[in-house]
A protein has these predicted regions:
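Short beta-strand edge/turn micro-motifs at domain boundaries
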Residues: 86, 107-137
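Hydrophobic (often cysteine-bearing) scaffold residues that line and stabilize catalytic clefts
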Residues: 8, 12, 51, 106
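Flexible, membrane-facing loop/turn or short amphipathic-helix motifs
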Residues: 98-101, 137
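Short, surface-exposed coil-to-beta transition loops
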Residues: 71-73, 105-110
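A solvent-exposed, acidic/Ser-Thr-rich amphipathic alpha-helical stretch
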Residues: 28-93
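Short, low-complexity N-terminal intrinsically disordered segments enriched in polar/charged residues
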Residues: 1-37
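Beta-strand elements of well-folded, non-transmembrane domains
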Residues: 93-95, 130-131
Length: 139
């Protein structure tokens, strides 16, 4: 594995921000644009999905009934491996219930394989590893 140039690193960071924004703003078209058509996503005990459409549909069904959510993606490392780029990023997600009261906070990391397409970088494979989850009680 080798380092990537600044432009590639920034493009990958922008992709991950679009992913988080797509979920948090319930912009399912934006979220879908982050994945290849044949993307494989493994979120551990949460589930696994094949294809950008399936991933997006699951996220829509999971998040539409809820209140606000905030996905923060940090500590990004990016390296090159042949024609693909690999990235690891930390995620800290807060998801609130429909009344923005009780919710959950989950922390973990994404291990991604990304490919360059005609319209920019996309996630081709993702593995989410949850490190911690806790219930958030209303104030």
């Amino acid at each position: 594995m080798s380092a990537v140039d600044r432009e590639t690193r920034q493009d990958v960071a922008d992709l991950l921000v679009r992913y988080a924004t797509g979920i948090d703003q319930r912009d399912w078209e934006l979220l879908r644009s982050c994945f290849t058509d044949d993307c494989v996503a493994d979120y551990g005990d949460i589930g696994s999905w094949n294809g950008g459409d399936e991933i997006t549909e699951w996220m829509r069904k999971a998040h539409d009934p809820l209140g606000h959510s905030l996905h923060r993606i940090t500590n990004l490392t990016v390296s090159s491996s042949g024609d693909a780029v690999t990235a690891r990023s930390y995620v800290d997600a807060v998801v609130l219930g429909p009344d923005d009261g009780r919710g959950a906070q989950a922390a973990g990391y994404y291990d991604d394989v990304l490919v360059r397409t005609d319209v920019g970088w996309k996630i081709a494979r993702r593995r989410y590893t949850m490190v911690r989850m806790q219930v958030i009680e209303p104030r």
